[in-house]
Amino acid sequence: MELLILQGLQQDIKIFLLSPILCAIFRFLFIYFFAPNKTYKGQEKKWCSCFNYGFWWGMDFNAYVLLFLFLLVTLPSLGLESIYVHGDSIRVILGTLYFLVVYIAFLGKLIFYYHYKDTYNSNLRLGRNADKRNLLDIFFNQNHGGWILLSLPIYTVGIYYFLSWILALGTFAVPTVHLGYIYYVYNALITIATVIVYYWFRYGGTFKHRNKPEWDTVPEVVKRDMFFAKACIDDLIAFELAIRAKPQEILAHSDAETIQILTPLIKVEQDLVGTIWNSMRKKAAGPRIKKPKKIFLIVEESYSQFAFDDIYKDIPIANAGRLIREQSSTISIDNFLAGGLISQPSISSMLNGIYDVNLELNEKAYFWNHQLPTSLGKQISELGYTCSLWYGGSLSWSSLGLFAKGNGFHNIYSGFDITSNDTPHTWLGVYDHLFLEGIQQKLDENNTDNYEFHFIYTTSNHGPYTIPIEKYGFEKEALLKELPDYLHKHTEDIGTYAYCDYYLSQFVRYVQETYEDSLVIVTGDHTRRLPMPCQDKGRVHRLREDISTAFYLSHKDFDKSLLNGVRIGTHMNILPTIMELIAPKEYEYVSLFPSLFEQQAFIVTPYHWLSNSHIGFFKDQRVETLEGTPVYDYNLKDVVALQRAYMEVTGAIVRHQL
């Protein structure tokens, strides 16, 4: 009897070996398309270590190709003639399906990296509540979605015929066994050996589960280049890690665990939630300016500090905003963190006064009907202000209308409510200049002497950058003349940013002129990576440039020394800063963070952190000086403890309040 099991196993191995080869090809393409530094000469060790470690880490999925083909085709073919006859066809179909999934994961990673400059991460799970029409708009208009979809059948057919050709190649001759029991012993031994080999590959060339490849053990030579460190993660592995990173974990902690985790931030002896709230109670030192009749907190979509750095001085991207920031009565902070990496958790954190931690608190019905002691709308209204929220898009986005009402806002306006039915808009919202004109018209119509707080959130500075800005004062030809040649391909991107900055700044000037005593605060909901404003191929985006959002505040009585040289801040400082500017002496308010009038050694969010000398990103364990020099030996122990404590505050409150 021929040992047909060996013949089938050889066919399985052919497809199995193709798996890491295909992943390596996709890894190379990812590096080719996106790596800031593609230099090979002199960096051979980094390249080789990246591909070697990626090979073994990828086996966490690819090893299953060997196991499943062996179990689903080779073993059954020993007893079922129909499977034996059609075995190669079954292998080709199964292999094609797997490689199609690998290809889709690769394309998804390219798109994800294009927008977030990261491989798949926890933002992935927030997509279920995103505006699907906007996602489709971005996919087809910014990411060449039509070509991507066209590539799927072409790739599938190509892989199918390639696998058919591979399996049609000859195999080594297999021995013949004449004794029946020896035949079964050989089959059993080969089966056991195959399973053992599967485990050996799946555990990264070891039989010890704890030695499996993971982020913490990426070779140091690779980790020093953060892009290559991410590139060594196969696409399906990155997708799995993102899906498994469940933010709900903090909701499963016991009170005893919470008390322990909170220790670096809050000492709790009894009454966990009461102690948390009491720790946030603060007394205002007394007003620093006369109580303004109008306060404007403007959150510009993707408004990034990078655009205001000196390196962008000669690029016409934020010229209007620069002029506002240069006013003697305007104070800006150049190192400023949002409460989230993307819009939803950022806005949720700002309004609730506690970090959202990707729990999507804005989508929970409790927050549509209840306020926290830290709620922005509630606390500002208690100072005597009528609070209005203005959003450029639909109020159904992230349940913003319901959430803002629950937060304490008296009036909620959509961009579609304050403009005509035929007003041009993207899938996200009304074009910024028309949205801001609509607000201006409403304010002029209802001009009163009342105390009013206006939270304004725009939408246009967002992909796919299809707004016809040439109709609104930004001629493409004129922009091309001002841009260096190497930035011409980014005209739509830069032009859209300049358009948004210009009309935002026009609105700020309108507020300053119309309401002379107004307090104006401007920030971004998060950052977005801007085109590199120089041709230096060796220069990579610095961490601060990637995650520091823009921030400034303006009032006629301000001078540049008001904040005593504070260099760092976060969205969570905004509410207490308003309180310390206008609240009566000894007025009590509730805030997770102090105001910007206090020097802070560390600012920590669930995602990133700042000190007066360093900036860090938790997911990658990446640390740089504020000037952009990488730091590889920074002791993160205390910072991580603070990160966990701030997240635990949210977990404890949600567990006990909801």
Whereabouts are the PLM-identified features?
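Glycine-centered secondary-structure boundary/capping sites
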Residues: 80-84, 117-123, 137, 143-145, ...
